[in-house]
Amino acid sequence: MDGIKKKMIAMKLEKENAMERAVQYEELLKKKEEEREKRESEIAELNNKMKQAQIDCDEAQETLQEQMNKLEETDKRATNAEAEVAAMTRRIRLLEEDLEVSSSRLTETLTKLEEASKTAEESERGRKDLEIRSIADDERLNQLEDQQKEAKYIAEDADRKYDEAARKLAIAEVDFERAEARLEAAESKIVELEEELRVVGNNMKALEISEQESAQREESYEETIRDLTERLKAAEQRATEAERQVSKLQNEVDHLEDDLLAEKERYKALSGELDQTFAELTGY
């Protein structure tokens, strides 16, 4: 019985440990929520960078348009200068130099525009990656919340079963003690009846020696013997019934021990699943 009580105490401690782990998982959920908010902030920052990159791209396009306009103006000036080749040779040379400078600037502008486009593409890819990771984190958080609810339900169910097992065990202990008392009383009664039979046997021997006893007394003694014999049989039956009751109570106690052991194994399996989930979250 002490072993069963110790097992019950151990189950209570395991239940409390399961509740503590549930609290730890709630704290882990809060931490994951904070990480998700941080990532959303990073996504917003990337969006701002993309907007700035778009602004830079627009400015580069405006610069390119200005350079194209200047190039068209230079072509017009060169066309007009062809009519005055002799007089405008030096001026044409200067315009050609301006054209080379403009072309160089145009090339630089196009290079910057290409770099800005690459930066915008990289920012878009980074934003999509963060969105995917945020979705995965949300799914993981939902799964963890479901596991936490299941753990609480199992802990409550185990607590109810523990109370029911303790109640049945207390009843079984009372019945067992009563059966033991009845068995002791039956054994005492058997001894008493055996002593009475011994006395009756001695009396019968005395009656056999004393043949002068009346037939009425002899019949009375025979009736007493039959009565005592019936009482002995009844006592033996009660003793047998008491032994059967004790065996039945012992089987119930064994069954309760098996139930307690099964609940302990269930707690152990649940603890392993929760620890594995926590390890996966930590590794993630």
Swiss-Prot record:
Residues 1-284 form a coiled coil. Pfam families: Tropomyosin. The keyword Repeat applies. InterPro entries: Tropomyosin. It comes from the Eukaryota. Keywords: Coiled coil, Repeat. Gene3D superfamilies: 1.20.5.170, 1.20.5.340. Residues 111-131 are annotated as: Disordered. The keyword Repeat applies. Homodimer. The molecule is in a coiled coil structure that is formed by 2 polypeptide chains. The sequence exhibits a prominent seven-residues periodicity. Belongs to the tropomyosin family. Tropomyosin, in association with the troponin complex, plays a central role in the calcium dependent regulation of muscle contraction. This is Tropomyosin-1. It comes from Schistosoma mansoni (Blood fluke).
